[in-house]
Amino acid sequence: MKKLFPFLVFIILNNTSLTCQILENKVYDLDSIIIEGVREKNIIKRLDPIQGTYIFSGKKNENLSLTQMDANICEKNARQIFSKVPGIFVYDMEGGNQMNIATRGLDPHRGWEFNMRKDGIIINSDMYGYPASHYSIPLESIERIELVRGTGSLQYGAQFGGMINYISKTADPSKKFSFENYSSFGSYNLLSNYISFGTNLKKIKIYAYLSKRNRDGYRDNEHTKYDAQGINLQYSPTKNLSLNFDYARSYYLYQLPGPLTDSMFYADPTQSTRSRNYFNPIINVPSITLKWKISPKSKMQFVSSALIGTRNSILFDKPATIQDSINRITLQYENRQVDVDRFNSYTQELRYLQQFNIGNFTNHIAGGLQLMTNDLHRTQLGKGSRNSDFDINLVDPIWGRDLHFKTQNIAAFVENNFEVTKNFSINVGARFETGESKLKGTIVYYPDNEIPVSIKHQYPLLGTSFTYHLLKKMEIYGGYSQTYRPLLFKDLIPSSTFEKIDPKIKDAKGYNAEIGFRGKYRFLQFDITGFLLQYNNRFGTLAFTDAQNNFYTYRTNIGNSLTKGVEIFLQAYWYLNNVNKLTVFNSSAIMDGRYTSGTLKSGNNNINIEGNKIESVPNLISRNGITYQYRKFSISLLHSYTASNYADAFNTELPSRTGAVGLVPSYQVVDVNTTLKINKMLEFKIGINNLMNEKYFSKRPLFYPGPGVWPSDGRNGSVSIFLKL
């Protein structure tokens, strides 16, 4: 047998070799196979329950993919970008420079009710003095947008609106070198160009971009000049440790066409009342981020960041009823008002996440510290030139207001995620804020000793949330979280000698509460949420007379409000065949926001506003869309409806002579966007905004950029070419 075995092996190997030779000498003709399909688009997802050092379990949230959208990205069209987020109120009047948005009946001005972040880095200009975000992100540089409602606020801040986090693109990990170019042109002489470069050098990744955009406006005397730059360098010495250096800058100069009265708007919404007004923010955001995966169950993140920049404003600041014309005597224009804010905001944030087991259940605890040191230097009421161009030089070196608003605040936060069963988990959290804001400086028309000098912020904030998985892809979730909002710099500055500030004035505070049902069933995706938003210590003005019978106004906390509503997101899709897909969705919010108590000055009288509706809270915001996909082509139709709402707390129906107050009429807008992906390297986008040329406005601002009607854009279109190498 031993002698036979080698012989058998030889025969087997020899036959195998011979068979291979025979096969190699034969040629087989195979039928061709065509693989057909439709390019998959999953624009909206939910955040993972545990993501990085954050706990999102039990929170209302959205995760939006910008790279898959049929939307106007270069002009930051918020109603298209956030179309699948129920109840997003869009205040669109600034030519694509800023996204003014809010949810749940809050103020949309530059997103200042949100904790605004880019890659986890705070981009609110000054969280305590002026929380508006003046940094203008080129959305071509953004991969996706994360949005978390206010019930998750304990982990990142105390804002009523919640958090918006823009997640940037990075270098393509599959390539040593990558390049992107996103060029757009369109109506109103739109020209936009975005270029990015990425590289991978073993342990180092680099991504950098340049963006430029020029655009005239829908209205006369409206123009935008914009540019932005950014660079990101990531060094990963090990797979568990990374150090990230990031610098981003944005600049834009916007020529404002001025407010209109209602009669002007209905006669011709494209006309302007100003030709010499300008707005110019220049913002720098440097940061360093350290991420360390200490063990499979432990993560740490440290961020040191700053926001440094200026906000320049040049205005002939009068109502629309007063013309900005040449004086017949001097044969010159009147002097313009110059205002300059200088932001110096610094944030240090340490976060830690620990996973631990209790029996067979996995639990997580997240905690950290946040230190903010801000100095907002505000110079206002400067006497500017009589020129028509952008010129921030003063003809008189004395500012009407020259003030510093310095804040130092520290916050400690912790949140624990407990798995009670495999399907049911509870989160319990707390945040403690302690700090102080100090105001000092001069106001030429006001005694120095009567300016409020110190405001303390000390708040213990509590919250809880839960999630219960009914089935694999369905869950009930809910939560409650306390919130607060610091008083803004502008609310503490008396506008005249006849105005006084309550020395016991308080920050606004309240809570968010919600309960929802979300998931997927066959071809249907859904998320339905009921919410309450309590907003106490709202700020306003009262009228009084002193002992000598002199009239004066008094700025103080005037009352409380409650907004309640339902947010509905429904989306269904059907594969008609291998290459055709149809998607329809509805994204709506039904809201009722009212003052539960309050008194406000009207003329020389104080009026009770209890039961009145809150400003800029429409009863219904609804967006409905349909997308048809064929192979690599898609076309999307979006219908947006916003119900009428009030511009002031008195619920004034008839417009005032200046257009500053009155009902904001309901409006509906239709947008069409298409995308054609030629191959992996080349893509075309064509869009028409406001297809039916609806003439509308979304808000009557009571302060900047001027009281009155600010028309939104009429019909306009754009073509974009996207090249990726």
Kindly label every feature range from the protein language model.
Residues 137-180:
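A beta-strand signature from Gram-negative outer-membrane beta-barrel systems
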Residues 248, 478, 582-590, 610-725:
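Conserved C-terminal beta-signal and adjacent last beta-strands/turns
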Residues 352, 422, 530-534, 552-650, ...:
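Gram-negative outer-membrane beta-barrel transporters
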Residues 185-214, 219-255, 278-298, 431:
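Transmembrane beta-barrel wall of Gram-negative outer-membrane proteins
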Residues 253-268, 377, 436-443, 454, ...:
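Surface-exposed extracellular loop regions of Gram-negative outer-membrane beta-barrel proteins
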Residues 89, 121-149:
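Short acidic/polar hinge/loop motifs at secondary-structure boundaries
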